[in-house]
Amino acid sequence: MPDLEKDMQKKEKDSRSKDEPAVPKLPVPPLQQTLQMYLQCMKHLVPEEQFRKTKSIVEQFGVAGGLGESLQLILEERREETTNWVFNYWLDDMYLNNRLALPVNSSPAIIFARQNFKDVNDQLRFAANLISGVQDYKALLDSHALPVDFARGQLSGQPLCMKQYYGLFSSYRLPGHTKDTLVAQKSCVMPEPEHIIVACNNQLFVLDVGINFRRLSEGDLFTQLRKIAKMAENEEEMLPPIGLLTTDGRTEWAEARTILMKDSTNRDSLDMIERCICLVCLDGTSGVELNDTNMALQLLHGGGYHKNGANRWYDKPMQFVVGRDGVCGTVCEHSPFDGIVLVQCTEHLLKHMKESSKKLLRADSVSELPAPRRLRWKCSPEIQAHLASSAEKLQRIVKNLDFIAYKFVNYGKEFIKKQKTSPDAYIQVALQLAFYRCHRRLVPTYESASIRRFDEGRVDNIRSATAEAFAFVKAMIDDKPALSDSEKMQRFKDAIAAQTNYTILAITGMAIDNHLLGLREVAREHFKELPEIFTDETYLTSNRFILSTSQVPTPMEMFCCYGPVVPNGYGACYNPQPEHILFCISSFKDCKETSSDMLAKAVEESLLEIRDLCNKCSSSTAKSLAKQEEATQLRSDRKL
């Protein structure tokens, strides 16, 4: 990719399919609405004295003719001049400015059902099948033939922006010393042969998947993968595990990459990686009991450098892991696209593989296929020092992660729907109750809400720690003996309503997080100092998401997981099924306040307690209705 080193700030425009409906521009919410919602969101989460100070600062910011209105006008002008007024601000803030290492901290993983590979050929057949599915899906993208997504859940039926899909196989996150760059591959009329990178035994190989404008068959791919597996065993050809460098902090990796780029051999190898469609990581055995928790850990960090942690290249958006022991899934660099896009793509691949696996796959004997190429590296002592440092830091990440994949089996979304409640709102309120049960407080909570109803829309935040949720959790724990079941039920309904209303605001572009971010970044561009509203302790607190949550629903046999976003926080990803709910809960062992196992147990207690409350109240409602019917019948009988 010749322009990788250039400053590429502008996102490449995707050509829209003629069948793809136009979606509107993201609105800029009214200033006063956002300021009032901000105060409402934070009032019960900070000390009273601190809130009084914040309220005064916010009122000053929002005064008629004041600074807030000036910044709002600039944002509204920006909306007219750009496709999406918050896109670049959000991308920088959420991902590209973040200096933390990608494993656990940023890159989510999807774990497939465990495969039963009898031998290495089974592993390679699975990988060949998967690569064939990637080619199939990429062909849909290249021809803009992917069916348009429509919104589900709240306000369902609206068409969604499809641009994120075109970053699945054409993007690359380039490390920078202070800020990363999201690079998009430029399409050309006569494309060169497409290739993927195969990681095997910490070595990297180029596998051409199209030769002479002919797509390789699964048999061809299997043949080539067998060659790679054999090449990777050659001890004499073994090179340092350069993929380890991508597990480091972004600034450290940028420094190491600058050193690598001084040598032409390294430049050529980096260029091949940066232009590839995706990675396929042929992992060795993990050496652990293969339950959901341990399989997820293998995808999140590979078990460290002495297992499969160096058999990766984290800058590439799509890494497909195929482990010798049947641990398979996807590791995703999150900056080009959101979770639902990753899930839709993965679902398509798994369906393709299920259909394709019915055929017996044999190696094709095509002698004219060129052998895959091993990527070569020239490693200076400086790079060797970087590799040693990266390996040590990856081990720290591995040891520090406290993770559990927990299946709640007592009920699922079918029971929740019978309560005439959104499963997502119900689970979010249950998570607030669980957190309060563990820590006796609520904290700023992040739940991602898609804004793909708008052009270039990514996500905004549903702030689930509402005042109504706070009233409910206190009723269930602090005021339990004093309140009747009907009073608790009313507070539960209020919490569900508040969560649902905020969700609707978020998906329609009216939530507060993106708006406040836009105002802050416009102020940064136009003034020497940030306005006090953005340096105030309450604003800083509001952006430390101690509870980071996401619903990733899928009917397929797979699940998603990720790490916490702050040192004293939790990641909580969940997949509601008809009769169970799967939770993936993460925290850090360094933090003595948090425990993933403790939160998982609290989630179970909370879900059972809410179910019992619903059952009691529906039972008493049924009895009350029966009594009313009986009284009506008696009056009727008397008249007769």
Curated annotation (Swiss-Prot):
Stretch list, region Disordered: 1-28
Residues holding CoA: 412-424, 450, 551
Protein keywords: Acyltransferase, Neurotransmitter biosynthesis, Transferase
The EC number(s) this enzyme carries: 2.3.1.6
Role played: Catalyzes the reversible synthesis of acetylcholine (ACh) from acetyl CoA and choline at cholinergic synapses.
Family recorded in the similarity comment: Belongs to the carnitine/choline acetyltransferase family.
Protein name as annotated: Choline O-acetyltransferase
Source organism per UniProt: Gallus gallus (Chicken)
Taxon lineage: Eukaryota, Metazoa, Chordata, Craniata, Vertebrata
